[in-house]
Amino acid sequence: MRTVTWNPEVYGRYSGERSRPFVDLVSRVATEDPTRVADLGCGSGSLTAILGERWPDAAVSGFDSSPEMVAQAPTDLPGNVTVELGDIMSFDASGYDVVVSNAALQWVPSHRELIDQWADTLASGSWLAWQVPGNFDAPSHALMRSLAESAEWRERLGGVLRGPEGVDSPVAYAQRLQEHGFDVDAWETTYVHVLAGADPVLGWVRGTGLRPVLDVLGEADAPEFERQYSDLLREAYPATAAGTLFPFRRVFCVGRKR
């Protein structure tokens, strides 16, 4: 898996829009008294705090592989919440009552096998819940891939970006959990964000999907790629007096082990 460098400040510019799927996800985890809760790919832990507030008697652990993100963990986290460096691929689900992952598994090519592993490991009555972006066919990502594979950029960026095959449908994820003895609630939602400012879609993807490109190109060449990419985005997502409409599909799966 390619290592991605994260910029907490850039990622956090749309924190309100990014937090809503997390809240929608965990609202479907219908348990009142878990003892141990894990948040995988927690970033700075600002959303992990929600889990600590919801389950004040649980030990809530947030894990993220980005030192930059973990270093930005809020100083006022609930006392039952910790945020630490940890790799999703080496996470051991043993002993956890709730395992949550929000907008992280799409970065892990082997995440399907990890889901199988966690599902086998979790005890009866435990919960496994995740959300992944399902917008890899959207113009924001399709145009990025097309530009990266163009003659000008292919030599440096060919194969850097993931395609739609990186995540599954709600049905496929539901079937996967059912095979491991889970009762499943799976769905998809398209959030239509109204973004303000100049080139807001570029500003959004700078914090997530564009990171692999920026890491490869570096400060010398990234601005030229962004210039070409932003021209394409303005046509695909025209600005209006009320803002720029940015549809964003997300895929959710929540399961309780019987």
Where are these regions (language model features)?
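Conserved class I S-adenosyl-L-methionine
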Residues: M1-D33, A38, S46-I50, M69-Q72, ...
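Conserved Class I S-adenosyl-L-methionine
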Residues: T3, S44-S46, P164-R258
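Short glycine-centered segments of the SAM/dcSAM-binding site in methyltransferase folds
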Residues: R36, S126-W127
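Class I SAM-dependent methyltransferase SAM/SAH-binding core
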Residues: R36-L40, S44-F91
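A short acidic, Gly/Pro-enriched loop at the edge of an enzyme's catalytic core
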Residues: M89-V99
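A short SAM/SAH-binding and catalytic strip from SAM-dependent methyltransferases
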Residues: V98-H111, G134
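Helix-to-beta-strand junctions that scaffold the AdoMet/dcAdoMet cofactor pocket
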Residues: V108-P109, L122-S124
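Conserved catalytic/acceptor-binding region of the Class I
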Residues: R112, W127-A196
